[in-house]
Amino acid sequence: MTGLFNNPRRHLRTLIKQARKEKDPDVREKKYNEALEYGHGIEKKLEHDPDIAFIIGTIYYIKGDSEKTLEYMNKTLEIGIFDLDALAIKASVYLNLKNKDKVIECCDKIKELDPKNKSLLEIEDELKKI
């Protein structure tokens, strides 16, 4: 019965929600850092869980750390190669870095999996602007 209440993914998402609600930027940053600390603490135990890698990568994305975001999205895709959200975030990071080739590579993978994907259409529109 204790396993029912011990859900690390849920707790990590709760920490992120708390950070997102915070109005003070310094406190919000601190809460995101706390979420990262917790995420890294459970990462080894759940190393084959693509959700943990994805959530940690998303925190880095929110914080604007492109390198770490890509690292964790790549981990997510190593575990779950068909993760459309991870591919979309990777494409968005590469879009921000103005790396057209990598954006196109991610978009091509998304197209293979889901040609009508909403994120894909948005990313392709943004790609035309760079």
Where do the protein language model's features map onto the residues?
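Alpha-helical adaptor scaffolds
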Residues: 17-85, 89
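Eukaryotic alpha-helical solenoid repeat scaffolds
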Residues: 1-12, 38, 129-130
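Structural signature of alpha-solenoid helical repeat scaffolds
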Residues: 3-6, 44, 78, 112
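Register position in tetratricopeptide repeats
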Residues: 62, 96, 126-130
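Extended amphipathic alpha-helical coiled-coil/heptad-repeat regions
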Residues: 23-27, 119-128
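Extended alpha-helical scaffolding segments
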Residues: 84, 88-95, 105
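Boundary/linker segments of alpha-helical solenoid repeat arrays
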Residues: 84-86, 113-124
